[in-house]
Design a protein with these regions (language model features):
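Conserved phosphate-chemistry cores used by DNA topoisomerases
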Residues: 1-632
Length: 632
């Protein structure tokens, strides 16, 4: 208490203990009494206001503790002043950690890392008792305000509070993960839509195979194709869509993912456990895992995300031979009378087509979705069992998977896509494929397509879905107004659009918007409420109530004479939109755009069409443009 008097009284006051002078230290030096010198314990100190001094360090007790004074009174139980400073530190630290580390930390986790020092002067303070251990004066009556600076937070975070909070968060997440762990048992409950194998979880579980399929319709087809004997050995679980990328996700996010939690229960997986081959066969409810997805590019992505989940969370299972694999199903069939030929790649079909009179007399049916197959065809798939198992090749396989899913390796993905070969595909006759072959010959096609549909084409300025809309509008000769919802249906029918019409409606609305900040030249006309700049166009009316048609200027920019010389794409035998249009001015500059693909992203501003045209005229005449082209 003698040292306390020395720090809270005026420096002119001489303080003695048993006749020996006690040095009058300032508040920063006073902190040494509790936590030792700066060389021993790092701390942060600042004076945010002439009436306030604050300091903080890592708590030596692994729980929150504080030392505080109000007008020279030791408030050992804290009070409103401590709560005010602490809440600021905690809130700012949460934002700081999320920005720097992309990790969400709870306030209690930050608080338990801190030891807080506060010395303040409050006007007419009140306390909760006569011992004056806890100050309860409302903040509005303090006569001053303490604002914790960003510099204080930055120093405190780098001092070790951020690392300690993240470590504590991971420990709590690991404990939480244990609650979602699976175990080997004959019956499991609480997993909707899961159809288990009769032998799963029993003495013959090593002979069982779990099939992860894409959607409920795929599950229905697979179940219809299983024989009575197959029901003993095969379990089926439909995925709702694409799994999250678990490589960079924190444990809390993974624990809260219902899909992953269900897979853990079904297989009997334990978080963080390493499995040898013998342990996997003995402790898991299934001895093998197969993926059955649609034979399109998104299906390849789903397979890749599933592989990534096991590679990042249960790496040893990836190494086990014949544990992970997928079942090949035909991408198309050619039928002539009673004869049927199945093809598992487009290249195999094209080769056969060229050698057989261009397929004349054969009926072609595409099977890009598992839901296209009948129960009879699923029985054929399981009779043939064209199963391909993944093969692990050490660091080469690890690097291939990491390159695709590690968010920090965007530059590596750029180099990867720079070597893209559209003819490089997996051999459907192989029963084993390495993980690196899967990424380089199957996943890469999705990544290339992801860039094409997410990033505007440099030539015409359109993403794939918007180009389909423009193609459909030209094909329909859309000079009379039509409801946006009706146009979306027409686009789906005539351009091979395979995704939800909600995004298609949004694309049509976006192409027609003309408020400031949207399009400099809108390809479609907004006949109705298509949104305002107040909400960035998100406040448009329902697609059922608004109309649109081609803007008269659109056909001038994309001349009809060019239509016959464009290279048109093919989708399931249907002629669809061209690879790109050839506008007479660079629309990528006129309307700008943005998008994030695989490895690449783009964000471009809008520019004045008149200036762009003047610049082009100068270029055509061999002159230099003297104007200054600015965003417009």
């Amino acid at each position: 208490r003698t040292y306390d008097i020395g720090v809270v009284t005026d420096k002119s006051v001489k303080v003695k203990f048993n006749g020996k002078a006690v040095p009058n230290k300032n508040f920063e030096q006073y902190m040494d009494i509790y936590i030792g010198p700066k060389t021993e314990t790092k701390r942060v100190y600042e004076i945010p206001h002439e009436r306030w001094e604050i300091g903080a360090c890592l708590s030596p007790l692994d729980e929150f503790t504080q030392v505080s004074y109000v007008n020279g009174i030791n408030t050992c139980k804290g009070g409103k002043h401590i709560d005010f400073v602490l809440n600021q530190i905690v809130k700012k630290m949460i934002v700081y950690i999320e920005k720097k580390k992309k990790v969400k930390v709870k306030p209690a986790t930050i608080k338990e890392q801190l030891m807080l020092f506060v010395n303040c002067v409050i006007e007419n303070p009140s306390f909760d008792s006569q011992t004056k251990e806890c100050m309860n004066t409302p903040q509005s009556r303090w006569g001053s305000k303490c604002e914790v600076s960003d510099k204080f937070i930055d120093k405190l975070a780098k001092m070790g509070v951020m690392e300690s909070a993240i470590a504590s968060n991971e420990i709590k997440a690991a404990k939480s993960a244990k609650k979602t762990d699976g175990r080997k048992t004959r019956n499991i409950r609480g997993v909707p839509k899961y159809m288990g194998a009769n032998w799963a979880g029993g003495t013959k579980s090593k002979d069982c195979t779990l099939i992860l399929c894409e959607g409920d319709s795929a599950k229905a087809g697979i179940v219809s194709g299983l024989s009575k004997e197959d029901r003993d050995k095969y379990g089926v679980f439909p995925l709702k869509g694409k799994l999250m990328n678990t490589l960079d996700a924190n444990l809390n996010k993974i624990n809260n993912n219902e899909e992953i939690t269900n897979i853990k229960k079904i297989l009997g997986l334990i978080t963080g456990k390493t499995y040898t081959k013998e342990e996997a066969l003995k402790q898991l409810r299934y001895g093998k895992l197969l993926f059955m997805t649609d034979q399109d590019l998104d299906g390849s992505h789903i397979k890749g995300l599933c592989i990534n989940m096991f590679h990042s969370q249960w790496h040893d299972l990836v190494k086990i031979p014949n544990f992970l694999g997928f079942m090949n199903t035909p991408i198309l069939k050619a039928t002539k009378g009673k004869r049927t030929k199945s093809f598992y790649t487009d290249s195999a079909y094209k080769t056969w087509k060229q050698a057989n009179n261009n397929g004349k007399g054969w009926k072609i049916k595409y099977y890009k979705g598992l839901g296209t197959s009948t129960a009879k065809e699923f029985k054929e798939y399981f009779a043939e069992k064209k199963v391909v198992m993944f093969k692990y090749n050490g660091e080469t396989s690890d690097n291939a998977i990491d390159r695709v899913f590690n968010k920090t390796r965007a530059d590596d993905r750029k180099d990867w896509l720079a070597n893209y070969d559209k003819d490089a595909v997996l051999n459907p006759d192989n029963n084993k494929v390495s993980f690196e072959d899967f990424t380089d010959r199957e996943m890469i096609h999705f990544s290339k397509y992801d860039c094409e549909r997410s990033i505007p084409n440099l030539v015409d300025g359109w993403k794939t879905s918007l180009r389909k809309i423009l193609y459909a509008a030209f094909k329909r000769n859309l000079i009379s107004e039509i409801k946006v919802a009706q146009l979306a249906g027409y686009v789906s029918e005539h351009s091979g659009y395979h995704h939800g019409e909600a995004s298609l409606n949004g694309g049509i609305v976006g192409m027609a918007q003309e408020f400031i900040g949207s399009n400099n030249i809108n390809a479609l006309l907004p006949l109705g409420q298509f949104g305002t700049r107040l909400k960035g166009g998100k406040d448009s009316a329902s697609e059922r109530y608004i109309f649109t048609k081609l803007n008269a200027i659109t056909r001038a920019i994309y001349p009809k004479l060019d239509d016959d010389v464009l290279y048109y794409l093919d989708d399931d035998g249907l002629k669809v939109e061209p690879e790109y249009y050839a506008p007479i001015i660079p629309m990528i500059l006129v309307n700008g755009g943005k998008g994030i693909g695989t490895g690449f992203s783009y964000e471009g501003l809008c520019y004045n069409p008149t200036q762009i045209i003047d610049c082009l005229k100068c270029k055509l005449k061999g002159k230099e443009y003297s104007g200054d082209i600015k965003p417009y």
